[in-house]
Amino acid sequence: MEDNRIQNQIAIYMTNKKLCEFTDKLKPAPIEYYAHMHAQGEEQADGIRAYSCIGVVLQDYSNGTGDKTVRVTANLSPGFFPFVLRRMQNDLDRFDFTEDKIFGEPDEHGLSTVTKLSVKRASVGNDGKPRNYPWCVIVENGRAVKEKTATGGTHIKSGTYKKQRSVYVNINDLDFFNLIYRTTRFIESWELTYGPKLIRDARKLLSEQRAAAQQ
């Protein structure tokens, strides 16, 4: 009997050539930062810094499946989805969001992983006609040199980025709404599942620490 594998897929849009998928990569904050609820890069007990996010997967199999499929990935913060949903509920005409990230340890050539993500909506095309598929999601994966900023962060060093793969998916209003709505509801359900226990455990620990300090 084949094992029933647990899938982390939240929502998916698929045609005969393209795929857009959102996946569960949410992680609770450590108890020391319980009020964050979502992990935001705080150091965990094992020394690793974790981030709570929603995975984005785009695939282009217009040239074939298997080795011919182009697959790209990126991550979005949990707050992105209720933000977009609220904008969509206010009769959104245009939307423009871009985000570039560089992370991971450099390889033997000094290059780290780069993701470039773009989510845009344009109700009218360049020809002035209404667009049937006004939403466009673009993800690009590549490599670049990671450079530290004056404030201690990191960014892509100018002139070092090398694109490896890129996929775009055009989506109509209803299908994009379903993607965003289902993902937003999942995030809310996740928060209601993990949040209460995290808060209770933190409050209990805080009370114990205060009681010990008064002895």
Which ranges hold each PLM region?
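A cross-kingdom feature marking solvent-exposed beta-strand/loop segments within repeated
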Residues: 58-77, 154-169
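N-terminal "first-domain core" detector
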Residues: 1-69
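Eukaryotic short linear interaction motifs
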Residues: 63-65, 93, 145-146
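Acidic, metal/cofactor-coordinating or nucleic-acid-engaging core segments within structured domains
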Residues: 79-112
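Mixed-charge, glycine-accented linear interaction segment located at domain edges/termini
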Residues: 144-215
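Short, low-complexity cationic-aromatic patches
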Residues: 45-50, 74-76, 128-130, 166-177
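Short, well-structured alpha-helical interface segments that form or flank functional binding sites
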Residues: 51, 68-71, 75-90, 178
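Short, solvent-exposed interaction modules
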Residues: 90, 105-163
